[in-house]
Design a protein with these regions (language model features):
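Extended, low-polarity transmembrane helix blocks
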Residues: 1-44, 48, 55-66, 70, ...
Length: 139
């Protein structure tokens, strides 16, 4: 019984939840970052980028490059986390629509669901958001 109590306490502990949020933010950010950096350093691939909505392939390519480079940096720092993931959610929703297969799979889906989870959960205690809120509430 003591073991069950310990496990339940550990899973409901705000410190543990914040640590899980930190690890999840870093996992998504580190998985996204290489794609953004690759797009920034290889602009010749912009011509192959699909035209989406009313944007030219170049505009779509560079906006995806900026989003996929800077959103992970914001996620790793936990800075403006919920605000930062909004453009990434839009970008990965568009990427999912463009790349969805007949079997309803897309390489963008795991990122999209991860970003939505981060938007819902927030940044947690181990983030710049927490410390900004702490500093602003004490003044």
């Amino acid at each position: 019984m003591k073991m069950i109590s310990t496990i339940l306490h550990w899973t409901c502990d705000p410190i543990s939840a914040s640590m899980a949020s930190l690890l999840f933010r870093w996992a998504i950010a580190l998985a996204m970052l290489p794609y953004g950096v690759q797009k920034l350093f290889h602009p010749e691939n912009a011509a192959k980028f699909p035209k989406v909505l009313f944007f030219s392939p170049k505009v779509g390519y560079y906006s995806a490059a900026v989003i996929e480079t800077f959103v992970p940096l914001f996620l790793m720092a936990g800075f403006l986390t919920r605000l930062a993931v909004i453009p990434a959610i839009v970008s990965f929703t568009i990427a999912t629509k463009v790349t969805i297969g007949k079997d309803l799979t897309s390489p963008a889906l795991p990122y999209l669901f991860g970003l939505i989870a981060i938007f819902i959960v927030g940044s947690g205690l181990y983030s710049a958001d927490y410390w900004l809120l702490y500093l602003l509430s004490n003044n």
